[in-house]
Amino acid sequence: STYYTKDGRFGALGHGIGDGTQSGNLLYANSGDLYSMKLTKIKKGKAGAPGEIGGVVYFGKKSHIGTLDCNSNLGIYGQLDSDELSEYAAEDTYYPVAGKDEIHTGSAQMISEISGKLEKYNLEITNIDKKATDTNKGMELKVTDDRLIELSGGIVQGTSGSPIIQDGKIIGAVTHVSVSYTHLRAHETRSNL
């Protein structure tokens, strides 16, 4: 997930889940279940093609990690199971949320498990539009971390929701991939934090 609070509320993706049709409409869902998954493949992105990650979702009682209660244009939201929250809380760092006026161009990091373990990858925030009409595209990012470029080509489909950290604070999440660049860029949302 992009974030979770100390009481287990989570937000993820940074964009909603679509209905699977060409209309691009949101899937109507006011309840659902969240399950763990295992990353099984990475299709490297390149200019003109976004790349993607693939995985296997494990369904069943032992793999259930939470419940979903909202699917919106800004992401999915819900409640982590108490066992899952205890496990995450023991391992993770809590970050304060930056105010809009604290976000600036320059270095930042994305947190992702794309390598199979939770890691931080270096980014550069290249543009900020604090008046963006599309709340899911408030800034542009460029991957500067050679490890991520080597692994996936940059930001790829399936990395939506990866939190973006700047100056020790969470400033948003990866939401979209732009394929017109050699090292794939991402757009970010911060309105849902």
Report each predicted region and the residues it spans.
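Charged, low-complexity helical/coil segments in non-catalytic cytosolic or luminal regions
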Residues: 9-138, 147, 177-181
